Amino acid sequence: MPRVKRGVTARASHKKILDAAKGYRGRRKNVFRVANEAVMKAGQYQYRDRRQRKRQFRALWIARINAAARQHGLTYSVFMNGLSRAEIGVDRKVLSDIAIFDKDAFAKIVDQVKAKLAA
């Protein structure tokens, strides 16, 4: 079996890592050993934050809906309870957008919710 020198393969793999580390500060951008650790850590952050993004957006939508509902005299939990009782199937993302961009429509939804809660 012939001897295999790793020159081409090693250069390719190092180049791939160093290209991924472009824009990093200090030795992280041009020293392979340090750059490799930085790129691996960046991958861990990406993986974690893709999941956290979903939680953070849901929390943002809830905060917006809560603020809008309180302007109409309801808390978030009471408002969401009324939504389910009124069988209004609108998710939090859409409700948040309605609360920001179409205040009249949100007011109508709140009126329906209040009517259902009073009944």
Swiss-Prot record:
* Any one Gene Ontology molecular-function term assigned to this protein's record: rRNA binding
Q: Which GO terms describe its cellular component?
A: ribonucleoprotein complex; ribosome
Source domain of life: Bacteria
**Which SUPFAM superfamilies does the record match to this protein?**
Ribosomal protein L20 (SSF74731)
Keywords from UniProt, A to Z, are: Ribonucleoprotein, Ribosomal protein, RNA-binding, rRNA-binding
- Which GO BP terms sit in this record? ribosomal large subunit assembly; translation
**Role description:** Binds directly to 23S ribosomal RNA and is necessary for the in vitro assembly process of the 50S ribosomal subunit. It is not involved in the protein synthesizing functions of that subunit.
Q: Which family does it belong to?
A: Belongs to the bacterial ribosomal protein bL20 family.
Q: Which NCBIfam families match?
A: rplT_bact (TIGR01032)
Q: What is this protein called?
A: Large ribosomal subunit protein bL20
The gene is rplT
